[in-house]
Amino acid sequence: MAGSDTAPFLSQADDPDDGPAPGHPGLPGPMGNPKSGELEVPDCEGLQRITGLSRGHSTLIVVVLCYINLLNYMDRFTVAGVLTDIEQFFNIGDGSTGLIQTVFISSYMVLAPVFGYLGDRYNRKYLMCGGIAFWSLVTLGSSFIPREHFWLLLLTRGLVGVGEASYSTIAPTLIADLFVADQRSRMLSIFYFAIPVGSGLGYIAGSKVKDVAGDWHWALRVTPGLGVLAVLLLFLVVQEPPRGAVERHSGSPPLSPTSWWADLKALARNPSFVLSSLGFTSVAFVTGSLALWAPAFLLRSRVVLGETPPCLPGDSCSSSDSLIFGLITCLTGVLGVGLGVEISRRLRRFNPRADPLVCAAGLLGSAPFLFLALACARGSIVATYIFIFIGETLLSMNWAIVADILLYVVIPTRRSTAEAFQIVLSHLLGDAGSPYLIGLISDRLRRSWPPSFLSEFRALQFSLMLCAFVGALGGAAFLGTAMFIEDDRRRAQLHVQGLLHESGPSDDRIVVPQRGRSTRVPVSSVLI
């Protein structure tokens, strides 16, 4: 039996020692060159020939996509930067305030599969242009809502989800079709730097524009103008690359889209995709909760410590904590994303499971520091900021790595759909409900104590401690991902190269390339 496991498999030539056929560089992992577990990476000329774009143009496209990603997150967290003012203006409690983020995320979550389906089949550039133009108009409209119509603010924040859904499900797949291997990882890290930087700029812009204008409504009027510029850049700079071409062998036929139902079944049978999405869900839960509630929590901490006056109806609330938290978010995001990508890149040389293991380490490491940040807030605001800095840095290590995992375990014609359903899962169980849940728990706890500024602080403090527990669960999901990552990556590479085709609802069949040569294949590496 041991001999049969390494016998020539699917041979079309008499010479068992022949290498791969011309135009078919070594197969991935054990099916090709045993010295390399990666696809052969095209050089600059090869990428230019395949994509029809120069390296400079491809890099410029990534810069434009990064700018729009930054803008999306800047808009999302501008609201958090003026959250206390919104509470006072509309005279609402913590539960209703949490609904602002929940409604937006719910809309985003519902629309993501729609744009995922369209993004795998139609021109991605025009889909993004339309979505971002609509988002800019709705965001501008939300800044003119009178105080008696809070429901209208919720409606407009929900419609903002159209723009984010049209962009977030599609943009990473464009990067995947422009670059491969380490080049792709580097470009994804640049793209995902925009998330923490944009989030931090949202806090800063929201608080500072409010201070300068004397009215929080003006904070919501900054990003729509920048959105118009984003649409122009998309239209003039971005070009649609062929899907999956940079990963195919020169002799392999292009992949054709399958039905939406077939895509869903294939993704559900991909344990690396499912488990990494669950791990990312915990990241979304924690970041969504902190994004909305951390500035308010820090303000309440300062009030309890006697460092700032309380925010009373009719008064302008202190914006210093929004500014500081925004700066921390920017710095920790850049540091965390960069550290995560670099550590993972170095560890991959020795361990092919490095990506999920780094993600697990980041989440498991962040949990105790977030707990300490909350526990110390009653005694020292400086210690709280230090622990938040460390916790958010570890948490940010996941962003680019999770995106890279999805792109190499899912075939190109399913990537937008996979992005969409990762968004649905991470928001459905993550930040769609976490801000509202934290606010609801805070309200319930506060009602059980005598009214005071201390009870407001303690209620939010105890409710936010849920984040540390959820972060630990996410770390466990990434440890599970590490068990399957090698096999799922190899399967996706075989599909792209035309060596593994689906023939039924649950079976895969190996097909011989048209110019097939004798190849020694461990059967155990194929029948997975």
Swiss-Prot record:
Q: Which organism is it from?
A: Mus musculus (Mouse)
Q: Which reaction does it catalyse?
A: a 1-acyl-sn-glycero-3-phosphocholine(out) + H(+)(out) = a 1-acyl-sn-glycero-3-phosphocholine(in) + H(+)(in); 1-hexadecanoyl-sn-glycero-3-phosphocholine(out) + H(+)(out) = 1-hexadecanoyl-sn-glycero-3-phosphocholine(in) + H(+)(in); 1-(9Z-octadecenoyl)-sn-glycero-3-phosphocholine(out) + H(+)(out) = 1-(9Z-octadecenoyl)-sn-glycero-3-phosphocholine(in) + H(+)(in); 1-(5Z,8Z,11Z,14Z-eicosatetraenoyl)-sn-glycero-3-phosphocholine(out) + H(+)(out) = 1-(5Z,8Z,11Z,14Z-eicosatetraenoyl)-sn-glycero-3-phosphocholine(in) + H(+)(in)
Q: What does this protein do?
A: Plays a critical role in the phospholipid salvage pathway from lysosomes to the cytosol. Mediates the rate-limiting, proton-dependent, lysosomal efflux of lysophospholipids, which can then be reacylated by acyltransferases in the endoplasmic reticulum to form phospholipids. Selective for zwitterionic headgroups such as lysophosphatidylcholine (LPC) and lysophosphatidylethanolamine (LPE), can also transport lysophosphatidylglycerol (LPG), but not other anionic lysophospholipids, sphingosine, nor sphingomyelin.
Q: Which GO terms describe its biological process?
A: lysophospholipid transport; phospholipid efflux; regulation of lysosomal lumen pH
Membrane topology listed for this record: Multi-pass membrane protein
Kindly list the positions at which N-acetylalanine occurs in this protein: A2
The alphabetical list of record keywords is: Acetylation, Lipid transport, Lysosome, Membrane, Phosphoprotein, Transmembrane, Transmembrane helix, Transport
- Where would you find this protein in the cell? Lysosome membrane
Q: How does it assemble?
A: Interacts with BCL2 and BCL2L1.
Q: Which residues cross the membrane?
A: 60-80, 98-118, 126-146, 160-180, 187-207, 218-238, 278-298, 323-343, 357-377, 381-401, 421-441, 465-485
Q: What is this protein called?
A: Protein spinster homolog 1
